[in-house]
């Protein structure tokens, strides 16, 4: 994971250890509301913005950190159709028999963004009969039971038998952006800001890219 690798590098440089606590946005918000103390929060923009508005973050510390877009997943070894332009992607999708993406119970924001890409392409109605939401859609692709899928780029390399064909074109892309900020209750705000600056720096970009994410635009 990019963040853990960056934390290890930061520890080598500074001696400052980083401990991770993972959870869904709702779980993290509950912990914060219950008074649990953190030194840095990284959450999808709407979730962290809500905490910021509620006064839970130190003023001026919230930044857009990284973002992830939708990519096309295909079976490893399958023919590679053209998705390099919106028109090419539109034709490729309409030519398929079954197209999968995460179901609403497991996919969260990636489901919404997969649907946004289809809306941006203007093919929501045309393609409806081809869509196959599934909790293990990438498994269906690997078995040949679906032709391709729309997933967060960061999720695709993890699946066995499935490869990333590429991200969808920028003109129809939909991103999930993750913000970061220092809680007002942090016991080590200076160390937290140092780490935040490190993971948001250009030097961190290759690590994020290797994990399918990119530094967010300012």
Segments predicted by a language model, with ranges:
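Exported/periplasmic ABC-transporter solute-binding proteins
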Residues: 1-26, 30-34, 45-55, 63-68, ...
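Periplasmic-binding protein-like
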Residues: 39-42
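Active-site acidic carboxylates
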Residues: 58
């Amino acid at each position: 994971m990019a963040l853990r690798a960056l934390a290890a590098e930061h520890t080598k440089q500074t001696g400052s250890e980083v401990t991770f606590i993972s959870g869904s946005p709702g779980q993290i918000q509950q912990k914060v509301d219950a008074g649990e103390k953190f030194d840095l929060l990284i959450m999808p923009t709407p979730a962290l913005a809500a905490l910021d508005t509620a006064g839970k973050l130190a003023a001026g510390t919230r930044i857009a950190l990284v973002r992830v877009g939708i990519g096309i997943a295909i079976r490893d070894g399958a023919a590679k159709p053209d998705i390099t332009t919106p028109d090419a992607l539109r034709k490729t999708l309409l030519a398929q028999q079954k197209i999968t993406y995460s179901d609403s119970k497991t996919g969260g924001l990636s489901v919404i963004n997969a649907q946004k890409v289809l809306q941006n392409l203007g093919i929501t109605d045309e393609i409806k009969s081809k869509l196959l939401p599934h909790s293990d859609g990438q498994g269906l692709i690997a078995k040949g039971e679906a032709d391709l899928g729309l997933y967060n780029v960061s999720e695709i390399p993890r699946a066995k038998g499935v490869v990333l064909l590429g991200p969808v074109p920028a003109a129809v892309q939909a991103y999930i952006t993750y913000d970061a900020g220092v809680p007002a209750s942090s016991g080590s705000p200076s160390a937290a800001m140092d780490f935040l600056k490190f993971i948001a720096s250009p030097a961190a970009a290759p690590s994020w890219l290797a994990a399918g994410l990119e530094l967010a635009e300012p």
